[in-house]
Amino acid sequence: MKVLYVCTELFPFLKTGGLADVSAGLAPALQAVGCEVRLLLPAFPAIANQALSTRPIASLPAGPMPWGPAPVLPPASLTLATLPGLELPVYLVQAPALYDRPGNPYLGPDGKDWSDNAIRFAALGWAGATLGQGLDPHWRPDVIHCHDWHSGLTPTYVRAFAAAKQATPATVFTIHNLAYQGLFAAAEVTRLGLPKSWFDIDGFEFFGKVSFMKAALRYADRITTVSPTYAREISSEAQGCGLDGLLRERANSLSGILNGVDDLIWNPATDALLPAPYDEHKLQGKTLAKRALQTKFGLEPRANALVFGAVSRLTEQKGLHLLPQVLADMVQRGGQLALLGQGDVALERAFVDAAIRYPGQVGVRIGYDEVTAHAVIAGADVILVPSEFEPCGLTQLYGLRYGTLPLVRRVGGLADTVVDCTLENLDEGSATGFVFDELSPAGLLSAVRRAFVLFRRPDEWLAVQQRGMGLRFDWLASAQHYLAMYQTLRPGAK
């Protein structure tokens, strides 16, 4: 089965968040379970400049289509590239006027969305749909799997071709975060090459705007999210971001499949970024990682300190606004904090101020880099993920793998992957972390206090550590679920 994987980020070439990790893990896993996979991405400089070779395929089609004009694009073409360390072929949408810009792929130097993001990502969608129509005469996908709003017009264009009685591949759309919807002015409809008659409440119109996310949810053959709980949550008014009605309407086409962890990158037994390797049977290396983390973040080198770690975007969605309000209690109990992240300026300032207020107990790095992320996740005793909502979450999975107990809120993928250290769960041997419900300082603090209690019981702590480290959230399991879904989309499948 030929699968075209459409996305905008790919680790280690370009990463702004977990989407890059998912692409790097899932696409090769799909190949490993028998799919013939090719990726499609914009030719952002961070990716295109690392290509080992490129071969021209075709210019993107222009002019009239059966439903009206094609998207109005600057010169754009498709090349087939090879990237270092990646065995999968990669199509790159070459459009220098759209993509040849430094820095963040979505934001300008002012930190705001590029004003032409609608056409930038319409070009990606158009490339995906026309590959489905045979743009590459040597390779045509059976399934096009699209990820997040940036690729949301791919299923829309595919449906437009299907409405014109042309043979089309099946389409799958995965929601990584429903809150980011790709909303643009209604005036963009003609320039985007979309059927004008579809700009209504039953199409891709959303409160008077074009919604790339709604377009995908309306026109994709199947919809997935990155955890079963998140699939249920977004079908409710509370977390549906205004699209819950459509998602309930499409309930039979919606499912949740958990993300996995790339064992080549996140494995303490082989992680070259750590002071020493370790596993669930030999944890001496974790002790060294903790000492190294304390040194790196300017924390007092106390072996008996309960070190909390956080690697996150600093936003209210991630629940990090609660943390400054519980730091006094955490430090008073002998705890420490090592935080790596960036985002909301006010939150950044709050954490920098906390590091000044609690020298030797709170260490903060504003920014992000992989080396420090590995240091925090390996060296901390507890990893904090107190999110307001969390489609899947990868940080808690990394924590489990590294023997760093996750402390999470019971939402989305966090609820699906972490078992609370209640007395009952400890007794039956299923506990893997700390879970709380109420999105408040009091809710977070209750879980923090329970972490201190368990930390004073080293034998029980070790048992929970080892249980989490023994779990495997691997991409092959996720890929098998996706493959089974793809197979239901074959012509004649029941």
UniProtKB/Swiss-Prot annotation:
Gene Ontology biological-process annotations: glycogen biosynthetic process
Top-tier EC class: transferase
Catalytic activity line of the entry: [(1->4)-alpha-D-glucosyl](n) + ADP-alpha-D-glucose = [(1->4)-alpha-D-glucosyl](n+1) + ADP + H(+)
Function: Synthesizes alpha-1,4-glucan chains using ADP-glucose.
Family: Belongs to the glycosyltransferase 1 family. Bacterial/plant glycogen synthase subfamily.
UniProt-listed CDD domains: GT5_Glycogen_synthase_DULL1-like
EC number: 2.4.1.21
UniProt keywords, alphabetically: Glycogen biosynthesis, Glycosyltransferase, Transferase
InterPro entries documented for this protein: GS/SS (IPR011835), Starch_synth_cat_dom (IPR013534)
Protein's pathway: Glycan biosynthesis; glycogen biosynthesis
Alphabetical list of Pfam families matching this protein: Glyco_trans_1_4, Glyco_transf_5
Superkingdom of origin: Bacteria
Protein name: Glycogen synthase
Gene from which this protein is expressed: glgA
Gene Ontology cellular-component annotations: cytosol
Residue sites binding ADP-alpha-D-glucose per the record: K15
GO MF annotations, alphabetized: alpha-1,4-glucan glucosyltransferase (ADP-glucose donor) activity; alpha-1,4-glucan glucosyltransferase (UDP-glucose donor) activity
